[in-house]
Amino acid sequence: MGGQLSLLAQTAPSIGIFSYIDILDETHYVSQLNNSRFLKTCKALDPNGEIVVKVFIKPKEDSSLEKIIQRLKREAVLLSALPNVLNYSKIFESTRCGYLVRQHLKTNLYDRLSTRPYFTEIETKFVVFQLLQALKDIHDLDVIHGDIKTENLLLTSWDWVVLSDFCSNIKPAYIPDDNPGEFSFYFDTSKRRACYLAPEKFDSAKASGDGVHQATKEMDIFSLGCCIAELYLDGAALFNLSQLFKYKSGDYTLNDILPQTISKSSPVLKDILQDMLQVDPKKRLSAHELLEKYRTIYFPDTFYDFLYDYCKTLVTLGTSVPCADQIEVNTTLQDHLGSIDEILIKIYCDFGRICKSLKLPVLDQEDMNYNTKDSFLRVSDKLLRLENYETDKITASIQNEVSLIILVFLCKEFRNLQFPENKVKALQLILAFSLFVLDDTKLDRTLPYLVAALEDDSTRVKVMAMNCVTTLIKEVKHPNQLNENIFVDYLLPRVQALLQNGQEESLVRVAIASNLSDLALKANLFQEYCHTMQSSTIPNIVHDFESIEVIRKYSRKLQQLFEDLTVSILTDPEISVKVALLKNILPLCKYFGREKTNDVILSHLITYLNDRDPALRMYLVECISGIAILLGPITMEQYILPLIIQTITDEEELVVVSVLKNLKDLLKTRFVNKKYFYDITKFLSPLILHPNSWIRNFVLTTLVECINQMSKAEVYCVLYPVLRPFFDFDVDFTGDMLISCAKLPVSRNTYNLLRSWNNRSKKTFFWQRVTTNYVDAFGNSTINFVDKRYVKENYGLKTMKVESNIHLHTNENENIPLTLEDKFWIDKFKNSGLTDNELWKIVALREYVVRSSRSSSKKPETVTSIVSKLSLTPSNFSIENVMPNTVFFDIEFLHPETLTFNDLDVTNTNSIKESESNTFTDNHSKVIEMKGSLIFKTPRIPTTLSNLKNIYVQLEPTNNHSEGHAHLSARNQPANFIVKSSYEGQDKIIEKYLKQLNILPSLKEYKEFGFVSENTTAEADVINLHGKFVRSYPQIFDGTLLQSEVLLGTKSFMIYGSDQGALTVWDIDRLANEKSITRPLYYECSAEITCIKGLSGYDSFCVGLKSSEILIFRISLSKNGKAKNLQELICIRSLNLIGENSSEYPIQIECCPNNDQFQLVVLSNYSNVYLFDIRTMKVIEKLELNADYGCTISMVLDDKNNLLFFGTVSGIIEMWDARYFVQIRAWTFGESLPINKLAIMEQENKSLLVVCGGVDSAFFTLWNIEKLSCKHVFVRSNEQPSLDSFNVIDADKLDKLAFEKNNSNIKPIVQIFNNKVLYMDDIGRLLHILDTRNPEKSSTFAGSKVELHSFSVLQVTASLTMSLQKHNYQKEVNNSNYTSSRVMTVNVFQLKNKPYMLLTDEEGYINIYT
């Protein structure tokens, strides 16, 4: 602020400095950062976060700082757009002080130099580059900093440099060279005695002169050179004040000041400092010149071409920028919660470009020219090869470590990410960039952040972090001695804690199990490498012995940690966790060694063979052969080989296949002693007859391996007698010959029948076994079955003559006695196709079947297998004699609804069915039947039938009813009922389960909907309409009729709805009768009626309102003699559709009868589809259609209620499965015009889709739903349109959808009757009746004339037919009363076999034609 003012400044405030801060609005004092005599610097808080407030206390209260403040504000405006500058955001004065306010950053360069992790070489270069670039940017704006020092160079958490505390306008440009107090007063605020000022700044003449002097850019260059030198001197200042004066006078040179280490390690750096620290300002290079001169020489090209600009983009992304001529912007942390996620997504999407710019070798996923045996890391759309760093490109990338700049940003900002999916992407990026840094950097800079991610709340993040930790550790080739015990002291304890805390997260435990072996192998390599390095550097023998003892201690601790983790995983209750460990267990066995593997691993693996899950047994068998080779022949013979042979009898055939395959591999390695070949052959040879071809082929190939390792004499003396019965004739023992000459296997039915016989046999000799103490070579007890001799000796049959037909003769001339039950089973085999000569095959398979059955019964049932496989039952529990108990439900209504129909409604025995379940036997029912209704004046007390356990529905009290407004009380008050079950048992679990079932009556049992009608009135044959006017009715209520519906119930009704909410119901019989006039029923709704839909078979219908309501009405009839008259319109249900959008309302309703249910499908104006149960008016399903396809305006449900079709304004037709609410297909055609109407037409027992819209040249198109192809087109003219207009175009393949091509609010009216389409054009004048079967019979009504048209039918393709319209002649009809106004609705009905047509026009008239 000038020398004159500053010399008068108070050296200490008269009151506490905090009092100057607290008087500011929304600012709270925190602490004082320095106690400079010139400017007091404090940290404070405001709504935007932490701020720094610099306070200048005025020497006099009348002192004005206005001119200085104006200069500071102009400077701040210039600097506000630079991302590497932190300008003052608030500059103002009070009567006592001047204030400078800026954002607070925690770290400056001076503090960062003493903080771990220290800068690497590439980071130091990038910081220097940023400093020069920032200085260039401010100098380009003609802004001078004036006081560059390490305290004013701020750094973010990821080392982005920011210049702050510009002081060229508040501190003197020159100070006296004979007054050190001036230097301390202005520039030595930190009291470090370090001097960063340029030598020329010390000029007594200019400092004491009256002229205005400004600081120069060269001064900033010198100051920045001192900061750069300090950066390489590990925080030691280059000059103090006395040294600077000596340097200025020439007593010191730069070579004397710079240490020799800098000159030797980086001679280029010395050149840079010389160009910046010249005593003569004119010899100093500018920031721009320095950047250009040392490009490639010192700074990599990547800094210039990509890295700096990309980092600057990351800094500015999602941040707020002040408006023009503003120096501040108000923003809070809440405003930037998602900004880091946006930056992360950008880096992830730009990964390929980043790697290309940083010259990191990556592969595209489409590139198939890589070795598939290599491991790859997939990030975004790129692949990184793992464990293959031999190429020069990869080595250069690692040595350069340029990827560390992006890596540091990702690591520092990982904790600020909000969404788990973005954290997963960040972990992938961290791992990818870590592949291109040095090993020490991997362990010191990356690993801590990956390990910290193991404590994240998201399971996905934990799993990805565990995989990334393992991959990163595997990529480390040369660890240093500091990281020797990283597994014991750091990594494994955290993995152990993750395993213990993740008991409910099976995916986390799976990730640990799958990576444990790799970690164990790498931990062993770490120790071996570090021991080797240590032994070569320690010559002291005593110290060597001490080191060996420490090494052994850590080795034992490391092994114990891995042992604990392994046991926890091996005993985990989840099968998937065990399987994950088995897939990669060999490295873990190698780490433990033979003894530990036997004790820790093998003892647990043996128990897996008794597990119910076949996948676990199969994976165990696949890995057991490798473990056998690792553990040696003794373990192989004593433990593993017997287990393998035992598992051949597994009940799961895939497990058996896996066993045989691994046994063959073991034989091929000659790891099995020949003394076991006989027992193996004897055990396997019956499986040649097994119906599974895989088992059969693997058995034969296994036998070939045994034969190949034996001499010919051994084969014929030992194996030949065992194998001969299973081959048709003597053959050479080769694989091809054995397979081609083996006996045919038994069929699958025969094999299943044999197993069933074994399981169900009771009185049998065939399956009777003889007790023996003999065991085979594998320790398995042999199975001996009874024979004829044994039966005679032990069953008293020595002297008895036994019939020969109760013996089974085998190929070995062995007679097997049979009981009558056995004889019955043998007859079954013969009936299944097994001949007498083939019965020996079931004898050969008998032992294997018994062993496999015993193996199945030995496996205990686990909780997992009980839940996942309910069909498996424990062997000690039998349901063979337990009969199923079928439970029936019965629904009984408590009382009829307030509105009953006995007296009011007309009953016709031919057309109405009453539900039998609505009858009652108590006294109340008699009163109800006599009087018609029973109204309780006071509510009844809720009752629960506690004495009957099979009646469990609470009886709710009825509401008070008003006799005068009975129709209002009926709304949303369905009849109360109880549900009875036929279960009379005492099992609490079954009772609880039955109570949880949602049992509702069928719709026909709800009396408020009226009686079920069997009205089978046929649809009108509109082709017989002649256009003769019958009569006309004026609309007696306000509004224009917009909606209409014909309802076929006990009678035929015509329902109209207006835009004013007027709902009218007409009796069609009286409406078409010229001799009688009837007054319609009227109901005034609260808003415009948007849609009407009748409930087929009921005197009820649905109405949709623009006020978001859906109302269900019942038409009540009265009886006047034999006549049935309209009496009342009753609202029985209502529902408000308002959800997230208050302006949502229904635009179309479809009915979906589903067995005893009746569901409503409602389409809203927000393209949402709701499925309601009409009985409860509850939402069953909500479907949000694809907004990219445009607003949905039409809908239709097929006749079988299986398919839903939707049409949009952009011409898209969506086909959905109505049962599962899954989209099947979305397509468009033609010009993609709006789909105004969709309908279903039955033709030749096939459902066709009628589409009105999509193409302008046709009235409508017919589509084959099965083939999804256009079948028939009714063209508006006699010109054939292009075939391309009717090709199916997949909606997802469209680049841009056509929205609002047809802006007309007037839509054509389309009605479907049998095979005819009634089409009213969009101007409401011409009415077309188009016959899809006989196009020549189509006609058009227009005023008093009937235009007859013929259609020429063209078979364009094998599947497409076009009907081209041709105008023939006009026929005059006495039709003077034909409406001249625009037609609003068209309906057709049939009365006494005569068709009628009702037209409503915009003037409100209902016109009837025949």
From Swiss-Prot:
WD repeats: 1037-1076, 1187-1226, 1230-1273
Keyword Signal: no
GO BP field: cellular response to potassium ion starvation; late endosome to vacuole transport; pexophagy; phosphatidylinositol phosphate biosynthetic process; positive regulation of transcription elongation by RNA polymerase II; protein localization to vacuole; protein retention in Golgi apparatus; protein targeting to vacuole
Disruption outcome: Leads to large vacuoles and defective respiratory growth. Blocks maturation of the phagosomes and renders cells hyperadherent to epithelial cells and susceptible to the antimicrobial arsenal of primary murine and cultured human macrophages, as well as to thermal, salt, oxidative, genotoxic, cell wall and cell membrane stresses. Displays defects in protein trafficking.
Catalytic activity: L-seryl-[protein] + ATP = O-phospho-L-seryl-[protein] + ADP + H(+); L-threonyl-[protein] + ATP = O-phospho-L-threonyl-[protein] + ADP + H(+)
HEAT repeats: 441-478, 485-525, 556-594, 596-633, 635-672
Main EC class the enzyme belongs to: transferase
Compartments (UniProt record): Golgi apparatus, trans-Golgi network membrane; Endosome membrane
Residues given in the record as ATP binding sites: L33, N34, N35, S36, R37, F38, L39, K40, T41, K54
Keywords: ATP-binding, Autophagy, Endosome, Golgi apparatus, Kinase, Lipoprotein, Membrane, Nucleotide-binding, Repeat, Serine/threonine-protein kinase, Transferase, WD repeat
GO annotations of cellular component type: endosome membrane; Golgi apparatus; late endosome; nucleus-vacuole junction; phosphatidylinositol 3-kinase complex, class III, type I; phosphatidylinositol 3-kinase complex, class III, type II; vacuole-isolation membrane contact site
Domain Protein kinase: 27-299
Principal place of residence: Golgi
Subunit annotation: Component of the autophagy-specific VPS34 PI3-kinase complex I composed of VPS15, VPS30, VPS34, ATG14 and ATG38; and of the VPS34 PI3-kinase complex II composed of VPS15, VPS30, VPS34 and VPS38.
Function: Serine/threonine-protein kinase that plays a role in signaling in modulation of host immune response, intracellular survival and virulence. Required for impediment of phagosomal maturation in THP-1 macrophages. Regulatory subunit of the autophagy-specific VPS34 PI3-kinase complex I essential to recruit the ATG8-phosphatidylinositol conjugate and the ATG12-ATG5 conjugate to the pre-autophagosomal structure. Within the PS34 PI3-kinase complex I, VPS15-mediated phosphorylation of VPS34 may be required for recruiting VPS34 to the membrane but not for activation of its PI3K activity.
Protein name (database record): non-specific serine/threonine protein kinase
Source organism: Candida glabrata (strain ATCC 2001 / BCRC 20586 / JCM 3761 / NBRC 0622 / NRRL Y-65 / CBS 138)
Gene symbol of the encoding locus: VPS15
